[in-house]
A protein has these predicted regions:
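A structural signal for small-residue-enriched, beta-sheet-centric alpha/beta enzyme cores
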Residues: 161-237
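Feature marks extracellular polysaccharide-active and adherence modules
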Residues: 89, 121, 148-150, 158, ...
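N-terminal, charged/glycine-rich beta-strand/loop interface patches
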Residues: 2-132, 137, 144
Length: 237
């Protein structure tokens, strides 16, 4: 009788390729819509999915309804996604803001993606006034904002971006910011804007032909039939 001994072919730990860590990412959704009923603007639709959430602070009875958006995670990181939809139906009025500044944390590779859709019905009024977005060093943010405004509708929107937390002595030196706006009024494209900063962002912030040392940027947008009459006021700001 012969005896055969089989050699074990177990792989050694040194032969196993390391697996990159997989982090759980979020996909938040927020939908808010206001309508005018019996002469009063009020909430008619709300949908929210973590980490997006909507608060409704108490306001005086004669004031516009107010919604405050927030992310319960305290901010967004690489690979996270948030989709926000805000609408005011015909004749309605509303103010939508955020509870605090939105923080975009450092990414290990993937982009943070944010999609914002604003709709303003005929003869309606929407104030979209979020607090600033703070970009941490090596954050990667891709954001798209679209607005559709029906005839007679008006939109006041602001956007503020801070390249780091200046009060903490922090500054964004590298990463990605790809921010796009598109606004249509009465079916006509009236404003498009795109900002893309990639790679060595510090150099672009310091460039005299770029941001000339600024660490924050802000934009205010007003769309309405009476916009030309407000130009002197805007230029005086």
């Amino acid at each position: 009788m012969s005896v055969v001994t089989l050699r074990s072919e177990r792989p050694r730990l040194s032969d196993v390729a390391p697996t990159p860590p997989v982090f759980e990412r979020c996909d938040g959704v927020c939908e808010v819509r206001f309508a005018r009923r019996d002469g009063v603007s009020s909430l008619v639709h709300l949908f929210q999915r973590a980490p997006c959430r909507v608060l409704f602070p108490n306001v005086p009875a004669d004031d516009l309804p107010l919604a405050a958006l927030l992310t319960t995670s305290g901010g967004l990181a690489g690979g996270d996604r948030a989709r926000i939809s805000v609408g005011v139906e015909n004749g309605a009025q509303a103010v939508v803001t955020t509870q605090a500044a939105e923080k975009i944390y450092r990414s290990l590779g993937p982009d943070t993606r944010v999609d914002i859709a604003l709709t303003v019905g005929a003869d309606a009024w929407l104030e979209w006034l979020p607090q600033e977005t703070i970009l941490f060093d090596r954050a990667r943010l891709t954001r798209r904002t679209t607005a559709e405004i029906e005839p007679g509708g008006r939109l006041l929107a602001t956007e503020m971006i801070a390249f780091g937390r200046a009060a903490h002595g922090e500054r964004m030196s590298a990463g990605l910011l790809h921010d796009r706006w598109s606004i249509r009024a009465a079916g006509r494209l009236v404003w498009v804007d795109a900002l893309r900063l990639d790679g060595d962002i510090a150099a672009r912030l310091d460039a005299p032909a770029g941001f000339d040392g600024a660490t924050a940027v802000a934009t205010a947008i007003y769309v309405g039939a009476d916009a030309p009459t407000l130009l002197p006021l805007a230029r005086a700001l």
